[in-house]
Structures are given as structure tokens and as C-alpha cells.
């Protein structure tokens, strides 16, 4: 036994010697730390907006992919004054709800992109004002499912001064209609795609880069609220937005940075000038600032809470009445909300509310038929 223990101890010592041979001395650790600190200070002291070409070659393929996927939407239908006004109201509601739940800027941009592409591909009737609100709820719900990790219930989306309250099944069927209209392409190229690409190339080395990113997102929230920007390519909107932010951050020498940016994006000043001039005409981005501040506050509050409260106007949602054999489309009279009379001015009937106080805040709940997803 003693001999065996002695052999085991010798084997352990030999193994320890082998492990010791793998270690190396690091006497210059302090010097290396000083060198790294010096290099970081030099990099942070240099201009935060210079994009070095040698750092960008490896991401050129990503940029080419973005350009190949972006498509000119050409939404000329928004030239309609009435539709443009309705869109402004719908976009405002989307931004308010987006901030209410603390969703990201990308979620808001995606929702509005879905909205624009849908309303220009599908004929909405002006005598049914609830249609656009239903589309807005469905677009924001889809965008939240794509971008967010915590998504409210469909009934819970209907907050922030909503005029109508739709049942969950109604919203789901509108989601299906939007998905089929967009050919199930949910990860669309948006201006944020190009802004985030440039920021990723900068590497977010210092606070200036973060500030640049936040300012771009804030301005984009104001830009997408204006229907005049709908027809521009996402890359053009992104370039014009970043050029404007560069001008605000460094008013003394913005031209060189703007030229560098356009060179990276392979865009000419002439192609961006019209969009850039429109941005200059926008008022101070109070909308974007307010929405972004509210969004950040709400995101913090919702991160600490695992449940989302329903709006006070939402009550029991029973399956909406419908005719299974109906093949009517949007334009059919059966799509009208049920009323107690034939008068088109009368609102749909209300379901019973919980509590006496909620009776004072009743909102019309629309019961739409199954034919809501039928294409015209």
C-alpha cells in the first residue's frame, strides 16, 4: 500500500510540473495596461464620426445586401389629402402606444412601414373610419411581435385615446390580411437598418456615438410622421437624417463628415438633397424627443412588471358574430358594425361594462364578420 501511495504522489508531482510549464510570467502587465489606456484615449480623442475605410471592407457585403433588399415603395396614393390626414392620425396613435409600452424605435418604424404599404395596396373606405384604426392596431401588434420580447395582449394595445375597441379575433384576422398583403415579409428594410449599420461600423467607441444614434432615432420618429417622406428609399431617408444630425453635432466642419458618409453609402448629394431639404423644413423634433423620452421611461417601468394592464374600456371579448358562409369583402354592407337602426351615423352598440364608473367611459366595440379578411 505504501509503495502504491508513493507512486501516486510522484505521478501528481509530475503532472503539476507539466502544468507549471504551461504558465508564463507577465511582468509587463502594468505597462500593457497603460498602453491600452493610451490607445483608447487616442481613439476617443479622435473625431467620432470618421469612418475608416480599412475598418469597413469586411462589412461591405452587409451594405450590399441592404441595398439589394430595399425597394422603392412609390406610395403615390398618399398624395390624397384625406388619406394623408387619416394617416397622420393613425401614425400619431401608433407612436403614442409605442411609447406607452416602451417599445423600441424600430418597432414604431416597422409598424408605420406596414401601415403605409398596406393602405396603398388595399382600398380603404372613407365611410368606415374604424377601418384605419383596426389596421393601425394590427400593424403595431405585428411589429411588436417581430421586434419586442414582451408583447401585450391584443386587447391591451387599444389605449391612448382609441375611438373604438376591437375584439381579439377581429384584430387577428386583420393581422392575417396584412400578412398576406405584405406577402409575409415582416423584416423590411427601413431607414433604421442603414443608421444602425453605420453606427455598427463606428463601433460605439464612446458616448458621442451613442448620442449620435439616439439623435438619429429621435429625428426619424419625426420624419416618419410626415407622409411626404413615404416615397423615398430607406437609404436616402437614413442618409439625410444622419447628415442633419452631423450638422447639429459638429456645426463647424460637417461637410467632410457628410461627404464621408455619402461615400460609404454610395449615394450622391443630388439624390439626397430633396429629402434633406424636407427635413430642414420640419419643426424642432419635439415629437420624436417626447416619444423617445416616454418610451425609455415606460420601458424601465415595464421591465420591472411582468404583467400588462388592460385599458379600462376593454371588457369580455366574446367571439364576434359572423356568417360563416359569407364571402363579402370590405366594401360589402355586412362589414358595417352592427347598429340598432339603419342610420349610418349611429355608433355600434356597447357591451355591458364592469362597474358603474366604467359606464361613463364606454367606447364602441366593433363586431366585424369573418369576411373581414376577404380580398376584394
Swiss-Prot record:
Question: Mind telling me which Gene3D superfamilies this protein's record contains?
Answer: Cyclin-like (1.10.472.10)
- According to UniProt, the name of this protein is Cyclin-D3-1
Write out the entry's keywords from A to Z.
Cell cycle, Cell division, Cyclin, Mitosis
For whether the record's keyword set contains Cell division, the answer is yes
Describe the subunit structure: Interacts with the C-terminal domain of CDKA-1. Interacts with KRP1/ICK1. Interacts with KRP6.
* Described purpose of this protein according to its UniProt entry: Involved in the control of the cell cycle at the G1/S (start) transition. Activates the G1/S phase transition in response to cytokinin hormone signal, but declines in response to sucrose starvation leading to G1 arrest. Involved in the induction of mitotic cell division. Plays an important role in the switch from cell proliferation to the final stages of differentiation during plant development. May not be involved in the activation of cell cycle in the root apical meristem (RAM) in the early phase of seed germination.
Q: Give the tissue specificity.
A: Highly expressed in roots and at lower levels in leaves and flowers. Expressed in vegetative shoot meristem and inflorescence.
Swiss-Prot/TrEMBL GO biological process terms: cell division; G1/S transition of mitotic cell cycle; guard mother cell differentiation; response to cytokinin; response to sucrose; seed development
Query: Do you know which InterPro entries this protein is assigned to?
Result: Cyclin, Cyclin-like_dom, Cyclin-like_sf, Cyclin_C-dom, Cyclin_N, Cyclins_cyclin-box
Cellular component GO terms, alphabetical = nucleus
Q: Where is the composition biased (Low complexity)?
A: 321-349
Q: Where is this region: Disordered?
A: 298-376
Query: Highest taxon of the source?
Result: Eukaryota
Q: What induces it?
A: By cytokinin. Induction by cytokinin is blocked by auxin, but not by cycloheximide. Induced by sucrose and glucose. Induced by 24-epi-brassinolide. Down-regulated by sucrose starvation.
Q: How is it modified after translation?
A: Phosphorylated.
